[in-house]
Curated annotation (Swiss-Prot):
Catalytic activity line of the entry: guanosine(527) in 16S rRNA + S-adenosyl-L-methionine = N(7)-methylguanosine(527) in 16S rRNA + S-adenosyl-L-homocysteine
Subcellular location(s) per record: Cytoplasm
Function: Specifically methylates the N7 position of guanine in position 527 of 16S rRNA.
Positions with a binding annotation for S-adenosyl-L-methionine: G76, Q81, V127, E128, R141
PANTHER family with a match to the protein in the record: S-ADENOSYL-L-METHIONINE-DEPENDENT METHYLTRANSFERASES SUPERFAMILY PROTEIN (PTHR31760:SF0)
Name under which the protein is recorded: Ribosomal RNA small subunit methyltransferase G
Swiss-Prot/TrEMBL keywords: Cytoplasm, Methyltransferase, rRNA processing, S-adenosyl-L-methionine, Transferase
Top EC class of this enzyme: transferase
Alphabetical list of CDD domains matching this protein: AdoMet_MTases (cd02440)
Gene encoding the protein: rsmG
InterPro entries xref list: rRNA_ssu_MeTfrase_G, SAM-dependent_MTases_sf
Organism name: Neisseria meningitidis serogroup C / serotype 2a (strain ATCC 700532 / DSM 15464 / FAM18)
Amino acid sequence: MERKERLRAGIAAMGLDISETAQDRLLAYVDLLKKWNKTYNLTALRDEEKMIVHHLLDSLTLLPHIEGVQTMLDVGSGGGQPGIPAAVCRPDVQITLLDANTKKTAFLQQAVIELGLDNVRVVSGRVEAVSDVRADVVTSRAFAELADFVSWTGHLLKDGGYWAAMKGVYPQGEIGRLPQDVCVEKVQRLDVPGLDAERHIVILSKR
């Protein structure tokens, strides 16, 4: 199956409505990952088909969980997941990509320019040291244990905001270790077409 068809079929299977223009931009992002991977060590994946599944479709499972938000922070963004695919599909949301690895943030800056993402800002630094970002939703994909994630990023969450942590298997133990002042709003299993692995999203808020 041609890559454009594979992406379109995956998006349709997920019940998402994403324009042709946005889909083309998502594939341009995959091209950038492939182009700069050796220089910046962005992903262990080399196969384009797997990149579409793991980096695009997996990231797009976040979209239904950021309806109505105006600002989002992607912590430990790495090569830009889930932040860049989200930014492509939601140009109305101001998104900050944060990573401590300067090689990764150099790539992110390049990607933002080449993809024309006017709604994205890239910040280089450790999350605990960042103080000039406030977001309606703070997200991450495979970044840290939930308790550490909320502890390190609580000061970056707007009043009334929430965390959206993208995880693999159901994180029962991690949920049990969350601090008392954090409320688990929802844990939802995510279905990623073509991915033979468990995925969950954990929505958390301050009590």
